[in-house]
Amino acid sequence: MDPIALDERIGTLDYLRGFALLGIILVNILGLLTVKTPALHSVDAVYQRFLYFFVEARFYPIFSFLFGVGFYLFIARANTRGENGAILFLRRILVLFIFGFIHFLFQPGEALTVYASCGLLMLPFYKIKKEVNLFTGCILLLFVSIFAAKIFMPLPLILLGLSAGQYRIFEKLARYKTETAIFTFFMFILSVGGLLLQYCYVPEQPFNNLNGLEKNYQNMDQLKWFLHLGVATGPILSAFYAGFLLLLLQAPIARRLLSPLKSYGRMALTNYISQTALILLAGKLFHLFNRITYLQSLWLCLAIYVIQLIFSAMWLKYCKFGPLEWVWRMMTYNRKFPILLKKEAD
């Protein structure tokens, strides 16, 4: 295997991770603070529709796909260094599961334990041909999407991420701008079609979907189809979002303007868990549980964006890794790593 070129590819992945995190919090906050059901014809009702059209089930697929890419890169790099990549990866996902279990105590809808479990299931696929992984991932994703089986969605997405790593897609993006643009346009067309289909079932009244569907909700079948189609079309919109961002990143000015997103993504584990911490802290300090509205949840998320984006950029000016990324790395390799960046000599 050729040596893996890291810099540009990993930078691209960090932008995508950061972007995915921006969307994930908008949905997670709803359950964490038990957001109030919007009033009919209110701004909150409009924002709820926006979330279920453009955010819900549209961002975690990106994160799942990137986990698969990272899975491949981690083992490939370890093997290139002469280490046992499979054993190191097992230790890595064990530590991730521990992080996830602790996080689960505060956020029952957390994803780290799911990724760790899926990583264990996906390990044998590392040695399978990339063509087989791509075909299997597409078939599984189609099957899961048709049935809107959200709980199983990460599996095919991680497998597709693994195959993308095997194809070394993120090393070739600069050479395939036209292909990326065609893919993104195709995903845009499919996204428009999916959204129009979902719009046909948009519920007239706001709803509460935080702890299961309301039993006395009018037009229950319509609501179920609306939510079903939202999950089913999620990977398509995710692919469009990711493709559009990748096209933007081809421009140097876009990379500079979006550089805070890169730092945000480099500290994805720290920021994902601290999102929960900041939401729960705000809920406790400002008595937001069961009282906050949909629109107010957006303002709180924007405040958390500012805090985390600034913190990530400042932290990485002086440190090599995010706080939890550093702990994760040391527990994976069972040795200490310096966290501070070396100061350049005058």
Curated annotation (Swiss-Prot):
Coiled-coil intervals, chain numbering: none
Membrane topology term: Multi-pass membrane protein
Keyword Translocase: no
InterPro entries assigned: Bact_Transport_Assoc (IPR052529), DUF418 (IPR007349)
One annotated Gene Ontology cellular component of this protein: plasma membrane
Location of this chain's protein in the cell: Cell membrane
Regions that span the bilayer: 15-35, 55-75, 93-113, 139-159, 182-202, 229-249, 269-289, 295-315
Pfam family name, one: DUF418
Keywords: Cell membrane, Membrane, Transmembrane, Transmembrane helix, Transport
Domain of life assignment: Bacteria
Main location: membrane
Family: To E.coli YeiB, B.subtilis YxaH and B.subtilis YrkO.
Physiological role: Involved in transport.
Name of the molecule in the record: Uncharacterized 39.9 kDa protein in amylase 3'region
Lineage of the organism: Bacteria, Bacillati, Bacillota, Bacilli, Bacillales
